[in-house]
């Protein structure tokens, strides 16, 4: 019986994908789904593609090149487990993943939030940017579970009941950036019971050339558009205090072009609720002051 399905979108980093696969135990109750997003044959040897020689790995090759959101949605079609996890191809799981599988096989929870730590891929240095056990426990202890539900966007920072996402038809946005935000907010909204594990399960690697750190115009506009959608939803369910920080992406457009920035700023003012604007401005200046002091 398959208890856990893990979806890994991949594009052009086969060595890192192999490392990710090696970190996942070869258990009969674990299904691994790798969805290749039209990788370049000059970079990837498809005859020796990672996972092809492993019994619990299913490799799906797509030619559409529509990004991680499309790849994850494609992977969901093949899920057989009762729990769903995600990993990025350049990340990997800690040795505690076996413990996670043993501890939560029969859990009645809808979502298990997974602590992680962040490592610089080049230097191997531990970074402070991570979802710590202490922070998670504090949020639940102080009954701030909404912080997890509406601010924990990363799909790999949670383990989700498959029956729940199927019941509510929750899927990823098929956009070039921020495909996971809408998915995660909806998962947080519909989940009745949530919990956390009290140990590090996931190792996130920072690559500064990756999508997350790109100031590409298309990526920024995608993040802004998703932010508007999420903030409208949060406003409708009276959770606007967990707003998506769209202003940062609008301000980042200054580095691309002033005309584009002013155009998007006008749209931002028109589309964004006034209380979100005020909160965002306060947050922006608070961060500026903090950086000056530092």
State where each predicted segment sits.
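Cell-envelope/extracellular polymer assembly enzymes that use nucleotide-activated donors
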Residues: 3-5, 23, 31, 182
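Acidic donor-binding segment of Leloir-type glycosyltransferases
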Residues: 21-61
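Glycine-rich, basic loop-to-helix element that forms the pyrophosphate-binding segment
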Residues: 62-79
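Donor-binding/catalytic cores of nucleotide-activated saccharide
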Residues: 68-72, 89-194, 205-219
């Amino acid at each position: 019986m398959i208890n856990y399905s893990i979806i890994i979108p991949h594009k052009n980093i086969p060595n890192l994908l192999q490392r990710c696969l090696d970190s996942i135990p070869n258990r009969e109750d674990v299904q691994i789904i790798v969805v290749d997003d039209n990788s370049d044959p000059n970079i990837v040897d498809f005859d020796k593609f990672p996972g092809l020689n492993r019994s619990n790995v299913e490799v799906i090759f797509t030619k559409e090149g529509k990004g991680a959101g499309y790849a994850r949605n494609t992977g969901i079609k093949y899920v057989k487990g009762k729990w769903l996890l995600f990993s990025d191809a350049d990340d990997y799981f800690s040795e505690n993943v076996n413990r996670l599988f043993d501890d939560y096989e029969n859990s009645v929870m809808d979502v298990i939030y997974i602590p992680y730590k962040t490592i610089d891929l080049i230097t191997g240095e531990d970074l402070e940017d991570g979802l710590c056990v202490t922070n998670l426990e504090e949020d639940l202890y102080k009954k701030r579970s909404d912080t997890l539900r509406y601010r924990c966007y990363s799909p790999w920072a949670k383990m989700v009941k498959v029956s729940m996402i199927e019941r509510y038809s929750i899927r990823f946005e098929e956009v070039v950036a921020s495909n996971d935000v809408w998915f995660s907010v909806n998962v947080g909204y519909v989940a009745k019971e949530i919990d956390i594990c009290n140990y590090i399960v996931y190792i996130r690697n920072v690559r500064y050339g990756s999508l997350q750190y790109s100031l590409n115009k298309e990526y920024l506009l995608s993040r802004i558009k998703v932010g508007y959608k999420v903030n409208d939803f949060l406003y409708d369910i009276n959770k606007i205090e967990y707003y998506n920080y769209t202003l940062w992406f609008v301000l980042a457009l200054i580095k691309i072009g002033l005309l584009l920035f002013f155009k998007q700023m006008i749209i931002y003012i028109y589309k964004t609720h006034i209380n979100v604007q005020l909160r965002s401005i306060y947050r922006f200046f608070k961060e500026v002051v903090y950086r000056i002091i530092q």
